[in-house]
C-alpha cells in the first residue's frame, strides 16, 4: 500500500501495567491517526480508549485478543477459549494417569496480563471439568514486576508439591519455567506454553517445553493492516471476526 502514501507508527505498552496501556493510548490519540490496530488489554481499560476512537470516527482493529462487548472493525486471532480447550486435550495426552496439573501465571496487582489469557484458562478448565473432573488443578502466580523472585517461588512450589509432573502457562513466557526446569535438571515435567518467542523455542528444542501453541502473529498483523487499508482506502466491506488457525 506504499503507492497510497500510507505509513505505520508503532507504540508499545507493558501488558502487565494498565497505566502503560493508558499512556500509549494517549500518545496514539495525539497522533490523530486514520486507523488503529491494537492488541487490547483488559476490557475496562480498552473501552476508555475505544470510546474515544469511536468519538473521533477512527476505525480500530484487534489482533491477538478479542473483546466482544467492545466490538472492533475487525478481529484477527485465535478463539482464545477454544485454544485453551485444545491445550487441555494436549495436556492430557502427556499427563496419562497422573491427577495433578499446575497453572503458572504472571500477574500484576492480582490481575493477569490480558483478556486472552483469562479466556484460555476458562477454555482449559471447561475441558477438564467436562472430561477429567477428578483432576486437581493447582495455581502458581509469579509476579510480573518482580522477576528476580521467580526461582524462589518455583523452588517453594516444587518443594511443597513434589509429585506434580504437568503444567501449563497461558502467557508468552513459558521460558521462565522451562529454563528453571533445565537449570534444576527436572526432565520428568510436562510443560505446555504459548507463542514462538526465541527463548520459548530454545526450551522446546532442549526438551523442557513439550508443546508450544502458536497463533501466527505476523499474519495477524499483516491481515489487520490490509483490513484497515481496504476499509479506509478502497471502502471495502471488512469481515469482522477472523479466526486464525492454531499451530
Summary of predicted features, one role per range:
Residues 1-23:
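Amphipathic helical "hinge" segments at domain boundaries
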Residues 111-112, 128, 216-247:
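Hinge/cleft segment of the Venus flytrap/periplasmic-binding protein
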Residues 1-3, 83-87, 114-135, 149, ...:
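Short, solvent-exposed amphipathic alpha-helices that sit
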Residues 21-23, 28, 35-54, 124, ...:
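Hydrophobic alpha-helical
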Residues 76-102, 151, 200, 216-233:
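Hydrophobic alpha-helical segments within soluble ligand-binding/sensing domains
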Residues 1, 73-74, 100-112:
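Short beta-strand segments enriched in small/hydrophobic residues
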